[in-house]
Amino acid sequence: MKIGILALQGAFAEHAKVLDQLGVESVELRNLDDFQQDQSDLSGLILPGGESTTMGKLLRDQNMLLPIREAILSGLPVFGTCAGLILLAKEITSQKESHLGTMDMVVERNAXGRQLGSFYTEAECKGVGKIPMTFIRGPIISSVGEGVEILATVNNQIVAAQEKNMLVSSFHPELTDDVRLHQYFINMCKEKS
């Protein structure tokens, strides 16, 4: 099993460490050539946290947006954390256009406040159990479509969800020692292959 990690900007190295800890091979995807070379070998894709506007621009500049979108729509399992969640959203409240726009949800950017307003908590995540959650200016999922399953909420706000082959979290599971959400994603990848 090999999981690609979008490595244009953001917390990609931390995701690679977690996958390594779980005995799963990962590959950093920095451009279209990387993605096309590895696409047939990929069991899944991680879209890490970072700055979503910058990542969206880089995806467009590298001509990666459409090929990645097509792969996701064709069933490639994807895990978007924080900015990665924003990239997957069909609608972003403060923007006119979405990026990949594959997941039926409306997202509000930076809803968890400024960097100084970032926080840590623990909450139940369906299918995983009670897990630690680190929020860094995290987005909030304002609403989800019919086919989207809400996996976790904090303060009555949606912070994790799944729609078919797409898993998202507003928080950064890669910044804790708890690997269960990554294991949940790996299990999704195994089911698809």
Curated annotation (Swiss-Prot):
Catalytic activity: aldehydo-D-ribose 5-phosphate + D-glyceraldehyde 3-phosphate + L-glutamine = pyridoxal 5'-phosphate + L-glutamate + phosphate + 3 H2O + H(+); L-glutamine + H2O = L-glutamate + NH4(+)
GO process annotations (BP): glutamine catabolic process; pyridoxal phosphate biosynthetic process; pyridoxine metabolic process
A molecular function GO annotation: pyridoxal 5'-phosphate synthase (glutamine hydrolysing) activity
Pathway this chain belongs to: Cofactor biosynthesis; pyridoxal 5'-phosphate biosynthesis
Enzyme Commission number(s) from the entry: 4.3.3.6, 3.5.1.2
Domain of life: Bacteria
Keywords for this protein: Glutamine amidotransferase, Hydrolase, Lyase, Pyridoxal phosphate
Active-site annotation: C82, H172, E174
Pfam families registered for this protein in UniProt: SNO
GO (cellular component) term, any one: cytosol
Positions contributing to L-glutamine binding: G50, E51, S52, R109, I136, R137
Protein family: Belongs to the glutaminase PdxT/SNO family.
NCBIfam families linked: PLP_synth_Pdx2
Function in brief: Catalyzes the hydrolysis of glutamine to glutamate and ammonia as part of the biosynthesis of pyridoxal 5'-phosphate. The resulting ammonia molecule is channeled to the active site of PdxS.
Quaternary structure and partners: In the presence of PdxS, forms a dodecamer of heterodimers. Only shows activity in the heterodimer.
Protein name: Pyridoxal 5'-phosphate synthase subunit PdxT
Annotated organism of origin: Streptococcus pneumoniae serotype 19F (strain G54)
